[in-house]
A protein has these predicted regions:
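Short acidic-glycine loop/turn motifs at beta-strand connectors
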Residues: 31-32, 87-93, 182-185, 192-203
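Active-site pocket-lining segments that scaffold enzyme catalytic pockets across diverse folds
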Residues: 111-187, 191-195, 238-243
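A short, Trp-centered hydrophobic/proline-enriched beta-strand micro-motif
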Residues: 22-31, 57-59, 144-146, 176-180
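Short, surface-exposed beta-strand-loop junctions and turns on beta-sheet-rich folds
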Residues: 35, 43-44, 102-103, 195, ...
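Short Lys/Arg-enriched alpha/beta "domain-start" segment
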Residues: 1-54, 152-160
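Cytosolic ligand/metal-binding cores
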Residues: 95-98, 198-243
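Non-catalytic accessory segments adjacent to catalytic cores
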Residues: 45-151
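Short helix/loop capping segments that flank catalytic or ligand/cofactor-binding pockets
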Residues: 67-70, 89-91, 105, 156-157, ...
Length: 243
């Protein structure tokens, strides 16, 4: 697939996102590589890793958990997607990639909205019981590591503005990966200081962060200390086993 490249400088990458309000779209800020990728309008479902090289960028989504049966996740994941339009910022350059005809891109002003919301989840009692069970299990030696998660529901009297949320995530999380994916009126957004796996050519890297060892100051741990610490090694083995 041939992509045409045009220089394009926007005040915010979220402005590109706003130019495609009714399309499937993806937003990605990579702090490690200092790269921003915004894609819009599905071009193709990528068949496999070999087919992936026919496109400038592809987005892979997966829920990972077999128990994710909630309708809100229906149709999201388990596929690689190539987009028709991309906005890229990397190596001091900003440009617009498009397969086929270009569209006029406006530098839309991104709204900054303060959302007033409240938690409306109703499972706090179940969560407390789960935490007590985990604590008892660890105390009795039945388990060594548990990663627990809970879905929390928030409700606002006004619609949540995704563009504003993305902008706030970018501005307030300078050391995180920022992501957004919108499909069929549903949007998955977030920020994380870690990614489970990065695949580049023959390299597979993991940015998995955990632990409380100091990284700065006079008490900062050295590379040798981290690699030889028994507790740290046990945690790594447990994480790899769980993965």
């Amino acid at each position: 697939m041939i992509y045409n490249k045009e220089p394009l400088q926007l005040n915010s990458p979220v402005a590109f996102w706003l130019n495609f309000p009714n399309e499937e779209r993806v937003f990605w800020v990579d702090r490690q590589s200092n790269r921003i990728v915004v894609g819009a309008k599905r071009l193709a479902t990528v068949k496999d890793d070999e087919d992936r090289h026919n496109y400038a960028y592809v987005f892979y989504g997966d829920t990972f958990f077999d128990t994710s049966k909630d309708p809100k996740w229906s149709g999201m994941g388990h596929e690689m997607i190539a987009f028709t339009h991309y906005y890229i910022v990397e190596n001091g350059e900003a440009f617009y990639l498009h397969a086929g005809e270009s569209v006029s891109i406006e530098d839309i002003e991104v709204p900054h909205i303060r959302h007033d919301f409240r938690e409306t989840s109703d499972d706090k009692g179940d969560w407390d019981r789960l935490m007590n069970a985990i604590s008892d299990g660890i105390g009795h030696g039945e388990m060594t590591k548990v990663v627990a998660s809970r879905e929390v529901q928030f409700t606002s009297d006004t619609p949540f503005n995704v563009a504003s949320i993305l902008t706030n995530l970018v501005e307030n999380n300078p050391n995180c990966f920022i992501f957004g994916y919108e499909k069929d009126g549903r949007t998955f957004v977030g920020a994380s200081p870690e990614i489970l796996v990065r695949h580049r050519g023959s390299e597979i890297l993991s940015y998995a962060l955990a632990g409380t060892a100091p990284k700065d100051g006079p008490n900062a741990w050295t590379k040798e200390q981290l690699l030889s610490d028994k507790k740290n090694l046990l945690n790594i083995i447990s994480s790899v086993t769980v993965s």
